[in-house]
């Protein structure tokens, strides 16, 4: 279902010149389409909220639509929020579908598996950003800072498409940084959105998965 067909979507998006004004309460949430309710045999709008639910994982079997879902996420965020409100980064170890957004003002970059130097610089930058925000927030967290000061620094979303492939191709080089992001990122306004086949030794490992509050499940081979 195209987002344009969702009720109210076109009333609250970029009109070609300005983004809609932010609400009084800080929020970072977008609709992604419809989800099934098997019990009532119906469908309902699917909305995800980073501000309420922190990191997200999108799990499903091969060709279940995980990359398309990440594309929809980027599209929705770019149209609903200004670049001053949210910054996006993509790490695409799948089908390079995030390349469509490289020129968007919100997007700091999309990194592919052969961009080893760019990858190193990115994760170093994220470590520095967490330290910088730790000093800035003075013991508080991102939502508290925004309530007191407004959105002076943007929220950051790091999307990783095909987490298992990312781990394998980088030989788990960035596992420590990922653990830091998973554990402390939400407090600094830095959120993860990762796609995977599920949770486990070769997919999203426990020490990362324990910090992911929300899982959106597409078609699965088996229960995870």
What are the functions of these language-model segments?
Residues 6-9:
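Interdomain helical linkers/hinges and coiled-coil/dimerization scaffolds
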């Amino acid at each position: 279902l195209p987002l344009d067909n969702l009720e109210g979507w076109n009333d609250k998006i970029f009109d070609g010149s300005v983004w809609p004004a932010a609400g009084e309460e800080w929020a970072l949430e977008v609709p992604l389409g419809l989800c099934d309710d098997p019990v009532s045999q119906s469908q309902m709008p699917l909305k995800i909220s980073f501000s309420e639910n922190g990191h997200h994982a999108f799990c499903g079997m091969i060709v279940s639509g995980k990359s398309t879902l990440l594309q929809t996420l980027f599209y929705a965020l770019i149209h609903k929020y200004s670049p001053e409100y949210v910054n996006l980064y993509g790490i695409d170890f799948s089908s390079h579908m995030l390349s469509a957004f490289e020129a968007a003002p919100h997007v700091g970059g999309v990194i592919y598996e052969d961009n080893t130097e760019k990858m190193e610089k990115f994760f170093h930058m994220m470590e520095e950003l967490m330290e910088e925000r730790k000093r800035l927030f003075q013991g508080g967290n991102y939502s508290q800072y925004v309530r007191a000061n407004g959105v002076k620094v943007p929220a950051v979303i790091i999307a990783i498409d095909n987490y298992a492939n990312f781990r394998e191709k980088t030989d788990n080089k960035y596992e420590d940084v990922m653990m830091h992001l998973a554990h402390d990122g939400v407090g600094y306004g830095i959120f993860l959105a990762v796609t995977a086949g599920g949770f486990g030794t070769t997919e999203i490992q426990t020490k990362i998965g324990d910090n992911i509050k929300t899982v959106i499940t597409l078609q699965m081979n088996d229960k995870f």
